[in-house]
């Protein structure tokens, strides 16, 4: 039943997007919350999609030299550690890509299984 509803919803959205004069194809859009999830269901279909809300970078730090992961103190000021920089880079995901910034259908496809 849910699969039938999803197919009907997908067809309705596709018809709206392809309707002459439709502005929905206009380009990148901000998609947040349930709108983002609905868009992923539409784009990915039966394949589903991948979402990992939080990744731990500690296992990645094992591949780096010991002093790369430690805090650096120069002139009495604490600088951002390498680990903090890694966490900021790894946490970038679909929310940052499609909610904070506009994204395209091709960006969404990167999160399909």
Swiss-Prot record:
GO biological process terms, semicolon-separated: glucose metabolic process
Disulfide bridge partners, by residue number: 32-99, 44-112, 98-103
UniProt xrefs under InterPro entries: Insulin (IPR004825), Insulin-like (IPR016179), Insulin-like_sf (IPR036438), Insulin_CS (IPR022353), Insulin_family (IPR022352)
SMART domains per UniProt: IlGF
UniProt signal peptide: 1-24
Assigned keywords, A-Z: Carbohydrate metabolism, Cleavage on pair of basic residues, Disulfide bond, Glucose metabolism, Hormone, Secreted, Signal
PROSITE patterns, per database record: INSULIN
Propeptide: 56-90
Localisation: Secreted
A GO MF term: hormone activity
One GO cellular component, as annotated: extracellular space
Subunit structure: Heterodimer of a B chain and an A chain linked by two disulfide bonds.
Function: Insulin decreases blood glucose concentration. It increases cell permeability to monosaccharides, amino acids and fatty acids. It accelerates glycolysis, the pentose phosphate cycle, and glycogen synthesis in liver.
Family: Belongs to the insulin family.
PANTHER family: INSULIN, INSULIN/INSULIN GROWTH FACTOR
Name the UniProt record assigns to this protein: Insulin
Organism of provenance: Oreochromis niloticus (Nile tilapia)
């Amino acid at each position: 039943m849910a699969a039938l509803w999803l197919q009907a919803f997908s067809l309705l959205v596709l018809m709206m997007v392809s309707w002459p004069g439709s502005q929905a194809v206009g380009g990148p859009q901000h998609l947040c919350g349930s709108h983002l999830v609905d868009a992923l269901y539409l784009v990915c279909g039966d394949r589903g999609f991948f979402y990992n809300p939080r990744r731990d970078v500690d296992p990645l730090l094992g591949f780096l030299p010991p002093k790369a992961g430690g805090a650096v103190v120069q002139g009495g000021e604490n600088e951002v550690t390498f680990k903090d920089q890694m966490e900021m880079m790894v946490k970038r995901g679909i929310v940052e890509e499609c909610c904070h910034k506009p994204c395209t259908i091709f960006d969404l496809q990167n999160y399909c299984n």
